[in-house]
Amino acid sequence: MKQVEERYISLLTDFGFKRIFGTAMNKDLLICFLNSLFNGRQVVKDVSYLNPEHVGDVYTDRRAIFDVYCEGENGEKFIVEMQNAYQTYFKDRALFYSTFPIREQAPKGSDWDFKLNHVYTIALLNFSMNEDAFDKEKIRHHVQLCEIGRAHV
């Protein structure tokens, strides 16, 4: 009888992360992962993968390449990033990345009521943020833009 060789793929590598969460054949894994993060606050039933490379309006603008970029069935956008190396300004980078799907929602040259679909940036970090704003005892942090007095988006 032939022995089955076991193979593992590391989610901490760019290849492994994109292979598991960024391919249509594994879409169910991404949906399950997103739903586990939302913990019932929202239910993701389906996603469509989008082009992860974004460039600015002119060639001199900064570009962004997301690990995984997709759209939910209600028009919400999901950016999912795996970051191994420490980056001092990762919060700023995450906010910068979020501007691309926000800007995509603004049609050029037509009337627009400025209604925006939700944009979620999910970052799996293999390092500590080392900031006072984050509880060092927790491994998961939920951060959002909100009205401070009511803690409401």
Place the predicted regions along the sequence by residue.
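Elongated, amphipathic alpha-helical interaction scaffolds
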Residues: 1-152
